[in-house]
A protein has these predicted regions:
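Conserved structural position within tetratricopeptide repeats
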Residues: 57-61, 90-94, 128
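Register position in tetratricopeptide repeats
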Residues: 78, 112, 145-152
């Protein structure tokens, strides 16, 4: 069962199904595109909600699974529930303080919530961790994101809340 946890299920499978439905409804059946898009979005939402439920179940079984909390945060991102996304990433980081991608995603979530100081704080932490790992491609990406965050929150980079 853990094998499928890593490769068998993804929030993107429902998205692919939704795109297939879009193709069938518009191309083959000739329905208006806006109807097909509504069906596609409903499929996407159902898939994202199923992912939230699945990861909550995994967390119930193993509350110390940092990856499950991270994946839960990704599912909340897909639903646009950024406050919940932040909580899930924070829990993942609490369980593994060197979870680099969780720091990166947490920074992006804080940015979506317009919390510049926390966005910068966690992006800096992600940068430090990528430097330790010597992951140069990720370091460049984080530096670009940091530059964007500094530009966006020039006068708001005081002290983060968390």
């Amino acid at each position: 069962n853990r094998f499928f946890y890593f490769i068998g299920h993804s929030i993107f499978h429902p998205l692919v199904k939704g795109l297939f439905v879009l193709l069938v409804l518009t191309g083959i059946l000739g329905l208006p595109e806006k109807w097909a898009l509504a069906v596609d979005f409903q499929t996407y939402l159902k898939g994202a909600q199923a992912e939230v439920s699945r990861h909550k179940e995994i967390i119930r079984e193993d509350p110390l699974d940092a990856i499950a909390y991270f994946e839960l945060g990704m599912a909340y991102l897909a639903l646009g529930r950024h406050e919940d996304e932040v909580e899930a990433y924070l829990e993942a980081i609490k369980l593994n303080h060197k979870y680099t991608v969780a720091h990166y995603n947490l920074s992006m979530a804080y940015d979506l919530l317009k919390d510049g100081p926390n966005a910068i704080k966690h992006m800096l932490r992600a940068q430090d961790l990528y430097i330790q790992k010597r992951n140069h491609a990720r370091i460049r990406n984080v530096k670009r994101q940091l530059n964007l965050l500094y530009l966006k929150y020039q006068d708001k980079t005081k002290t983060p809340k968390n």
